[in-house]
Regions:
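C-terminal beta-rich recognition modules with glycine/proline-rich loops and embedded aromatic residues
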Residues: 493, 572-581, 586, 592-666, ...
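Short proline/glycine-enriched turn/loop motifs at strand-loop junctions of beta-rich domains
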Residues: 56, 681, 690-696
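Beta-rich interaction/scaffold domains
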Residues: 25-127, 849-1005
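Bacterial N-terminal signal peptides
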Residues: 9-20
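Helix-terminus loop motifs that line ligand-binding clefts
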Residues: 225-309, 504-516
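Hydrophobic, small-residue-rich alpha-helical packing segments that form membrane-like cores
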Residues: 344-350, 369-472, 479-483
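Aromatic (Trp/Tyr) and acidic
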Residues: 132-222, 260-284, 298-343, 347-358, ...
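Solvent-exposed beta-strand/loop surfaces of large extracellular or lumenal domains
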Residues: 695-720, 740-747
Length: 1005
């Protein structure tokens, strides 16, 4: 979703594009002496690749060292250039029977300058990918069936979340609906944040609020459940009251007024999107169509059919995104309330509470009814008023309203959240065959062919897209596979997830910068060139890059993929990493505040805030995250229990209580069973995850005896089906081990201080110290010049200190020591911390130098730059600009042209007249220009030239400010943040200037 907190695309001003003359030569800390460990062998990679697809290559390889130690290592494959992938996906160029090799490198290794060389042998074959059946092989236990126990960081965060939810004003969550549907608003608090009167995303926060209430209800104690239930019941009842106002019978049509009837095409083409029009649309709720429920008028999803751009003042924000949040909230209420038996019982003499005091099942049924009616509104609108046209140019595809190919390919405006997921889930929940079919059909109306088709063939079309706009679309596609059985949707999700793991994820599991994916394998460049400016246009490093919503949605996608293939431990390995690090660490442990962009890198400090679900998108996912930690702890089918996460819990399943006793985080866990059958036994198999990091000392004991001699990290170990009794005990021993999560690209430059945005460094691998599943960070390193170390090949210079006492949130605190510095888990940190270090792992000899001059990397970067120039030139040549905005914003584009010209000059030099250092610097500078460009509809810092002096003067030179001026300054500050972050639009700047000018004029200034 559109960002409203500090984060930045990493855009640099042209004046700051100069490079220092000499690279920083940093002192390195010597490694401990001893025999050097080197890679001895790497598992062979040989894949059959269905014709018309790009080979699926693993993102990590099982690696054996000279001393016998083994572990998983990350790999970078050298076929990631888009043109290369497109060629490999061509059946003409790569026909059945062709065999070829893809080169790759184990990253972080110094055998060569690029890493340890590996290769994949690929054979093109006929047929399709093998896919699992279109049904879950295992399902997570219902949220209400699992309860986190003890006093630890998990329960601390959960309780803080529930307390926050109970403190929120439910009337504020209902205000916009009553306002939109013409109901009285007296006694209702006006909404704020992104649900405020000046935003067009109203309703998104209420949707998150409903989901959070449901999850909290499943996780809370009895007393809290009573209070949560009152809120759930009230919000469901009042939303139905609003929805019923759209049930309008039309005697001429002899049916209810439907979604398809709203705004016929001629009228639609004339509709405006400004605030005056918005206020008029609110008066027309009788014509929204049967079942429409949203906090914004039906005009806004209709305007998307005319390809109206993201522009909060003049057009739309993301109307289907808001619809999704509300659908999801209602579905979550229906599911949870349907799972938890109970009825509200008012004690004698107790005052009447709002609501009718339905049973839980009645509340669930009403929530489902509301969601179903809204889902069928979506089906009706998209079925009758939209279509898909994929051929022709953009102008031809947009010649007629309603082309979904174009609608869902728009930046932000076309953001639909998890519409497909919610509609597919609704299809599973309703019983009427016609309604089931229509809801499933509606789910696939949110297919995005421009994005889906390449990724389904394993072509990485993820690059440069808006991250959180697209992750939920993949989750929805996967969910629809259950109903439609089309392998296309499973393959799409499988490919997407694996591309993310290898090419885009950071150590904590998060992704993106400025809400965007950059080029594949460029995480370190993106992190190190991310900057922000102050009001005087001074530029500073900005580590706030990984949007927390992305972590939320990647966890959800991972959980669903695991349901189809629960024996693939890689899914829960990743889930554990993103949960234990970014998600758990995204809330302040002492007072409620969650992160929007998660801080990553050098001297990073988490920007806690977003105190309400409506404050921002991440404020919304934030209230959900911390009341559902247990949702993927256990998976089950008829005969098997998968223990996927090791956390202190009690769970109910199959006539038994499952108790897992451990600390959190856990190096040891004990699992027992308490059957409540007449016989005192219950039969099933148990599968326990061996985490990817469990490379030393891992063991599983059943009643005191080890069940295996060896265990393969990143796998499951099965205890076959047996009769379990209360006397049985499973012990899992899993000592946390040290390892490195490496960035895939070497660091050769970074923003290092005020107006030092591109300080050069000697190229070096960058990595994060991991302690078991935990990302470790230190508050003791603040600058890159102090962050370069030589590391012993066997990590003997890393001291694992184990767990100490209470860390302030009642959990044991794991620490490690390295190079004289203390490291603590990232989730624990609330101050400044450094996650990544420049690490030189000692080798048996110097890295093998490149033979002669190698221009291949520069050549590839130039090709990417030329693709962008071609797209810009094609748009420039259009007589009628469709879309209205250019592909790339002008200042960033000009920087690209400048760096491209310089790079081509270097490329043209004879190999005898150029050095490798010169080539590498040219490639790096051009790569920065590519990775810091913005879409053409977004403002750039240069566009603040009128606003910045005005707001600075208003702050510094006008005493005794009026309320109007203070509010105008606050608004201007927000806009400056948005633009510097890479998320602001020109209309916001214009509005900020006008507000300041008017406020100053009213003061006589």
């Amino acid at each position: 979703m559109k960002s409203r907190k500090l984060f930045f695309c990493g855009l640099m001003l042209a004046a700051m594009n100069c490079m220092c003359l000499a690279a920083n030569v940093l002192p390195s800390v010597p490694a401990a002496k001893g025999k050097v460990r080197v890679i001895k062998a790497v598992e062979a990679v040989a894949v059959d690749c269905p014709v018309g697809t790009v080979p699926r290559l693993p993102y990590q390889l099982w690696t054996t060292y000279s001393d016998g130690y083994k572990e998983w290592r990350q790999v970078r494959w050298m076929n990631a250039l888009l043109s290369t992938e497109q060629q490999q996906a061509s059946a003409e160029l790569y026909p059945v029977g062709r065999e070829y090799t893809v080169k790759g490198y184990i990253i972080g290794d110094n055998t060569t300058e690029n890493g340890y060389p590996v290769e994949a042998k690929v054979r093109v074959v006929a047929g399709e990918y093998a896919t699992p059946a279109n049904r879950f092989k295992a399902q997570p236990l219902p949220l209400a069936s699992v309860h986190i126990t003890g006093e630890n960081r998990l329960t601390n965060n959960r309780d803080l979340d529930i307390k926050t939810l109970l403190a929120l004003d439910v009337t504020q969550q209902l205000y916009n609906y009553r306002d939109t549907y013409g109901l009285p608003t007296e006694g209702y608090t006006v909404a704020d944040g992104w649900d405020s009167p000046t935003t067009k995303l109203k309703g998104h926060g209420t949707g998150h609020y409903m989901s959070a209430l449901a999850f909290a209800y499943a996780s809370a104690d009895f007393k809290q459940r009573v209070e949560l239930r009152n809120r759930i019941e009230r919000i469901v009842n009042e939303l139905r009251e609003c929805q019923e106002r759209t049930f309008v019978w039309d005697s001429t049509l002899n049916r209810y007024w439907e979604a398809r009837d709203y705004a016929p095409e001629g009228e639609l083409l004339q509709m405006k999107g400004n605030w005056a029009a918005f206020d008029e649309y609110k008066k027309d709720y009788r014509h929204y169509g049967y079942g429409y429920l949203n906090a914004i008028p039906a005009a806004h999803p209709a305007l998307i059919e005319c390809y109206r751009a993201y522009n909060n003042e003049d057009w739309v924000w993301a109307p289907y995104y808001t619809i999704h949040k509300q659908l999801a909230g209602l579905i979550d209420i229906a599911n949870v309330m349907g799972e938890v038996p109970g009825i509200y019982l008012r004690k004698q003499g107790e005052p009447e509470q709002p609501g009718s005091h339905f049973s839980n099942n009645e509340i669930a049924a009403k929530a489902l009814l509301i969601a179903k009616d809204m889902g069928l509104w979506v089906w009706n609108r998209l079925h009758y008023r939209t279509y898909v046209k994929t051929d022709g140019d953009k102008a031809e595809r947009q010649a007629k309203p309603g082309n979904r190919y174009e609608m869902w390919n728009m930046y932000i405006a076309g953001e639909v959240g998890g519409m497909a997921e919610s509609l597919a889930r609704l299809s599973e929940m309703v019983s009427d065959p016609t309604e089931k079919a229509r809801l499933l059909e509606a789910a696939n109306y949110f297919d995005a062919p421009a994005f889906f088709d390449p990724v389904a063939r394993n072509v990485d079309d993820i690059r440069t897209r808006h991250a959180n706009q697209h992750i939920p679309m993949i989750t929805g596609a996967l969910r629809s596979y259950i109903g439609n059985g089309n392998p296309y949707y499973y393959n799409l999700a499988y490919n997407f997830w694996n591309l993310i793991q290898g090419r885009y994820a950071y150590a904590m599991g998060g992704v993106g910068n400025g809400e965007m994916w950059r080029q594949p394998y460029s995480q370190m460049l993106s992190m190190n060139t991310s900057v922000m400016s102050d009001h005087h246009r001074n530029m500073y490093p900005n580590p706030d890059i990984n949007e927390t919503c992305c972590a939320y949605n990647l966890a959800k996608l991972t959980k669903d993929l695991n349901c189809f293939d629960p024996d693939n431990a890689a899914y829960m390995d990743y889930y554990e990493r993103v949960l234990y690090n970014q998600i758990v660490g995204s809330v302040h442990p002492e007072h409620w505040g969650v992160t929007y962009q998660y801080a990553v890198g050098m001297n990073a400090r988490k920007p806690f805030g977003n105190e309400t679900p409506q404050s921002t998108c991440c404020g919304g996912t934030g209230v959900e995250n911390h009341v559902k930690y247990q949702e993927a702890a256990y998976f089950v089918n008829d005969n098997t229990l998968w223990v996927a996460l090791y956390m202190p819990t009690t769970a109910r399943w199959k006539e038994t209580v499952i108790k897992q006793e451990c600390e959190w985080p856990a190096e040891k866990s004990t699992i027992t069973f308490n059957p409540f059958t007449e016989a005192g036994t219950v039969a099933f198999a148990v599968k326990l995850r061996v985490p990817y990091w469990a490379t030393k000392g891992f063991d599983i004991k059943l009643n005191g005896k080890s069940i295996a001699k060896t265990y393969q990290p990143s796998s499951y170990v099965e205890i076959p089906k047996r009769e379990w009794t209360e006397n049985d005990k499973i012990e899992v021993i899993m000592p946390f081990t040290a390892h490195i999560n490496w960035g895939p690209d070497k660091m050769d430059l970074a923003a290092t201080g005020k107006n030092e945005t591109r300080t050069p460094f000697n190229p070096q691998w960058v990595g994060t110290l991991m302690y078991g599943p935990l990302v470790m960070a230190t508050p003791e390193i603040h600058e890159w010049k102090d962050a370069e170390f030589t590391l012993a090949s066997n990590f003997s210079d890393i001291t694992l200190n184990g767990a100490t006492g209470d860390d302030g949130t009642r959990s044991p605190l794991y620490t490690l020591s390295f190079a004289g510095h203390q490291f603590q888990p990232d989730y624990y940190q609330t101050g400044n911390e450094t996650h990544y270090l420049r690490l030189n792992v000692e080798t048996a000899g110097k890295a093998k130098a490149k033979k002669g001059i190698d221009k291949s990397n520069l050549e590839q970067v130039i090709e990417v730059a030329k693709e962008r120039v071609d797209s810009q030139n094609a748009w420039n040549a259009l007589a009628v600009k469709v879309p209205a905005f250019s592909p790339w914003a002008p200042n960033g584009y000009q920087r690209l042209l400048n760096q491209l010209k310089a790079a081509e000059t270097v490329m043209a030099k004879d190999k005898k007249a150029v050095t490798q250092e010169e080539i590498d610097k040219a490639a790096s500078a051009l790569n920065v220009a590519i990775n810091t460009m913005r879409p053409g509809n977004l403002a750039e810092p240069e566009d603040l030239n009128e606003l910045l002096p005005l707001v600075t003067d208003s702050k510094e030179n006008i005493p005794n400010k009026t309320t109007e001026l203070r509010e105008a300054i606050n608004y201007a500050d927000m806009v400056v943040q948005y633009v510097n972050d890479g998320s602001g639009t020109h209309d916001l700047i214009e509005k900020a200037v006008k507000r300041l000018q008017q406020a100053r004029k009213n003061m006589g200034k």
